[in-house]
Amino acid sequence: MNIPNVSGILPSADDFPGEVVTRAIVRDVDLGPGAGVLALITLDNGHDHTKPNTFGPQGLLSLNAALDAAEARAAAGEIAAVGVTGKPFILAAGADLDGAAAAITGAGVDPEEARERALGIASLGHAVFRRLGELPVPSFAFINGVALGGGLEVALHCTYRTISSGVPMIAFPECFLGLVPGWGGAYLLPRLIGPARALKLIIENPLSQNKMLRGPAAFELGIADAMFEPADFLEESLRWASLVLTGAETVSRPGRPDAADPAARAAGTEEEWAQAVAAARLFIGGKVHGAAPAPYRALDLVAAARTASRDEGFAAEDDALADLLLSEELRAGLYAFDLVQKRTRRPAGAPDKSLARPVTKVGVVGAGLMAAQIALLFVRRLQVPVVMTDLDQARVDAGVGYVHAEIDKQLSRGRISPDAANRQKALITGSVAKDAFADADFVIEAVFEELAVKRQVFAEVEAVVNETCVLATNTSSLSVTAMTSGLAHPERVVGFHFFNPVAVLPLVEVVRGSSTDDAAVATALAVGRQLKKNCVIVADRPAFVVNRVLTRFLGEITRTVDEGTPFEVAEHAADPLGLPMTPFLLLQLVGPRIALHVAETLHDAFGDRFAVSPKLRALAESGKSSVYLPDFSVDPEVIELLGGGSAPSTESEVLERALEGLAQEIKIMLDEGVVAAPEDIDLCMILGAGWPFHLGGITPYLDRTGIAAKVNGVAFRG
């Protein structure tokens, strides 16, 4: 097949000097009498699973060459089918985006040429992948491992698909990064499984902490036609393919496959498509408030897919992908993605891993909601005994009961087996006596946020644990060093600050107090890795990173309300950023009393940069937990509390003031050595506060907009 003429447009191998080429390696498999020979293409870049297969230009051309040979052999009657699978544990992780971005916008490339190059990459992907569905023989995708973006699109172009039940990740993460599924995904997936299910993968999951599916969930959605266990996945997939080829196994497809009208061949009715698209548009608006173009472009592609021909759908994807490959959104997204992937592997300031102590039993002081969430995470991830304590048996029973109930939920949803549920329940126990911590290796407190209370807790725990037990605090703002006053071994106390909800947010701030030794920090980091959390080491300064930055941001906005800015103006001033929630929804999540406590702590430490809002105090003292009623209408009693003032600001003035406050505070934090570098601030805000990927990190955003230079006289990255 002749691929599009992209000579002179498509970046050459010289433009992709770092491309790790994914080769298409072909071998024949005899499927037996009546089925014939299947030409099995294995995608393999020559590395193990820690370096996934990706598609750059040379990788695409390697697959194209394999398909040239397969097409010729099929025409000659030598093969009855073509199969595609990947190296162990990996099908493919999509396009080589770093290489593509560098090649498209490299030195000396003018804007017109850059777009032509981007269009060339988009067109090449379509031209190669679509051949899998246009061969003279059926094609089979055997999804043996991770399939992300272009990796999933390879499978969608095939006639049939099998999937391993052990696949850990299958997804379209493009909108998370600032792109669209541009090699067939936005057209093919909704036509296969219906618009509502497709939009969950294409838009909802990427904008929800980049959620991934596992193999069974993908099979349930209809992405694959059959599912097999990983131990004999390829053998069973080949056996199934032989049954399909001989007619012993039939696979139904949605719509009327032979109809001339594209709409008649697609899954779902016109009404179902309209409803799904409308719901997705509302969802996007609530998530990004118009600030990120990629999800809107993806939605437009899906909306058009029902009636568009394949050529029309793919051409629209080419156009969208070319535009977005050149966007600031993608560059920001790639910065954030690289930061999360690379900097979390070895946190700045991390001591030698060999200093970490083994953890075979965990203690949790407290049995409230936060403590119970922490205990549940330890049970699930560490699979070691966890004991909770509290002041009375009723509280202990409630905490243990919460853990049991959450395990039962996992069991009812089929996510764990009955045996696993029983094992996990057996690991969690409770006691009113701290003697239960005597043989614990790691004890974390999650009690009331008051220094005297936490000091008392640590004094009681230290009296019963062994000398090597690490004592951790989940404090969100208090001094770790101050908590160690009077302890015999302050060197083993470390901050271990989770974010709420514990199971969802991936960040843990590991706080080094003035006496904390390397063994305690190394153990905390090792535990964080076992919990599948990303750790950042921070200095023992009030509120650490995320809460300090958020409190300054929220404080600047609430101060404008004190001055007379109407609630609606202040609440929506930051909408252009596309933050995960508005300021007063954030206040609701944190709780006015906790927000007031953190603000007072920071005011005591840093003065009027963190002025305590009289209206925040009034809200906290009123007992109201939110500005909003349960139906999300505004509570008129709260609005009355927030009224007054004579110097209102506009939305743009509120946003400018809040961002300038952030620029000032982050510069001060870096000067204080709260973290090692601006990248650590960025990482904390992305992982702990949901700072949007489409903005990149917070410090490059403040540089890009000129706010950092305006406020501080210098950019964060000179």
Name what the model sees in each region.
Residues 88-102, 129:
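Amphipathic alpha-helical interaction surfaces in cytosolic regulatory modules
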Residues 2-36, 58, 66, 70, ...:
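N-terminal glycine-rich phosphate-binding loop for ADP-containing cofactors
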Residues 44, 78-89, 101:
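Short, glycine-/small-residue-enriched flexible loop/hinge segments at domain edges that mediate gating
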Residues 34-61, 88:
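STAS-typified acidic loop motif
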Residues 141-151:
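Gly/Ser-rich catalytic serine loop of serine hydrolases
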Residues 89-93, 148-149, 478-479:
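Short, active-site-adjacent cap segments at secondary-structure transitions
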